[in-house]
C-alpha cells in the first residue's frame, strides 16, 4: 500500500510521462505529513530546472521555499505578480500587503 507522499510522487511522475510544457499542481502537499511534504518540495525544486511549474497553494511558507515568481490572486482576480524575493519583501498592492500580514 502506498503512502500519501508516494501517491503524490506517482501522480507527478505520471504527469511527466507526456512531457508537458507546463505542470499545474493544485495544493501538491496538502494532507501530507511533514516528511512527505519535504520530499515533494525537494522533487519540485529539482523539476523546476526542466519544467515550468505552476503551483496553486495557500501554504505561504511552502511558496517561499519553492517559488521563483509569485502571482497573487484574490476573488478570482490577479492582484500582483513579481519575482519571489520582491513579492515577499516589497509587495505593492494593499490587498497583497494585508494578505501577507495574516
What do these predicted regions represent?
Residues 18, 49:
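Conserved signature/switch motifs of ABC ATPase nucleotide-binding domains
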Residues 1-2, 6:
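Conserved ABC ATPase signature
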Residues 34-36:
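Helix N-cap at the start of a conserved alpha-helix in ABC-type nucleotide-binding domains
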Residues 51-56:
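Conserved H-loop
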Residues 63-65:
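A short, surface-exposed alpha-helical micro-motif characterized by mixed small hydrophobic
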Residues 23-26:
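Catalytic Walker B motif of ABC-type/P-loop ATPase nucleotide-binding domains
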Amino acid at each position: 500500500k502506498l503512502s500519501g507522499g508516494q501517491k503524490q510522487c506517482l501522480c507527478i511522475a505520471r504527469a511527466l510521462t507526456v512531457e508537458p510544457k507546463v505542470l499545474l499542481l493544485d495544493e501538491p502537499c496538502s494532507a501530507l505529513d511533514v516528511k512527505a511534504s519535504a520530499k515533494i518540495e525537494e522533487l519540485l525544486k529539482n523539476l523546476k530546472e526542466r519544467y515550468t511549474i505552476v503551483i496553486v497553494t495557500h501554504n505561504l511558507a511552502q511558496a517561499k521555499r519553492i517559488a521563483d515568481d509569485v502571482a497573487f490572486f484574490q476573488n478570482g482576480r490577479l492582484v500582483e505578480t513579481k519575482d519571489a524575493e520582491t513579492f515577499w519583501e516589497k509587495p505593492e498592492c494593499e490587498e497583497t500587503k494585508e494578505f501577507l500580514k495574516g
